[in-house]
């Protein structure tokens, strides 16, 4: 036996497999202010104790592997390992537990959402000892937050750029989402902006297809913006989707948007990736562009209740990576979203400091230490009858986006925009006068429609529209 082998054996190295909980389950651990804290919903396989399952998550998302390795002796596991420090059963669910894991900050590269997610939600989600695993929430320490730029501008700077205060902003996604020529697309943009909307939007899958190349779309939309601004005296914008197949092409499109003098561009941050998104956010801050973020693909990740990742985690990641707007659900439209849970992550997007509140899905107190806020965007199956509820639920710091609810107006695009603007102004005025939007909302809309034929026509078209499907899961 060589001296080296004898030395290693003498310090206690023993090859083989041992339970994760012996090393990674530490219920006496006191979390540090610099730790990243994670709350996982864990569903162990039959026969796997919850402590072992929670420890396995901590191990496989930090320093652990399936067997003991001799190179463990070359570093300090106590310094670098993740720790499962608390486990609690999920009320009303069989064999589901919330496992709380603390990660030392040294495990993560500064300013990199990509690296953070590669560790915390990487290979561990395919681990055989778990039937299902869901990341419910993260506590990002202030020391780590300060390594990120965050949103290019934030809520207050955006309002100052647009000179719009005291109300939600209004938007519209141009439909049909695919198939229009650039000129017809620009015409729809102009009509909606002229009618009273603040923004129009590329749909998330509008990039640079054969029927409408990106440069042509950018040019016709810029023309529409300038014409609408001249006629209305208001600052207008269109979310020009810069998402592309490469980061270089994405930046090239953003550069062209800046050269046209438009105020805002757009990115699909999940399909485009966090590295690309952070690069674009940095470019937007340096060059005075606002950045609208679409969350296409989020439901693949967040819709299952016991596996994947809750959108509040994706929302926190977006605030770190950078974006001035992000889609957040509506509570009232065609897309899924529970009111209290949705408002929980809306507050995580906008506010500087958010207290732990399990009733709203917030597992940890979060301090954003001066990182700018993000405007939540309510979009998907909403129309004028929803305006009172949306105004009450989301408040002033939001974007209310009506696609079909604008372009589906029987008189055309501009009257559809007029109807939405009148409905919004009526709701804001009623709220400022002390009226109860939740109780008097329909009456407020009916009163406003008496002096707005465009709103009256919209009210008639969408009076019976509902999106109610029984939930089977």
From Swiss-Prot:
UniProt KW Phosphoprotein keyword = yes
Where do the catalytic residues lie? 175, 294
The propeptide segment or segments lie at 1-2
| EC identifiers of the protein | 4.1.1.39
List residues modified as N6-carboxylysine. Answer: 201
**Protein's job:** RuBisCO catalyzes two reactions: the carboxylation of D-ribulose 1,5-bisphosphate, the primary event in carbon dioxide fixation, as well as the oxidative fragmentation of the pentose substrate in the photorespiration process. Both reactions occur simultaneously and in competition at the same active site.
- Protein's UniProt name: Ribulose bisphosphate carboxylase large chain
The scientific name of the source species is: Sinapis alba (White mustard)
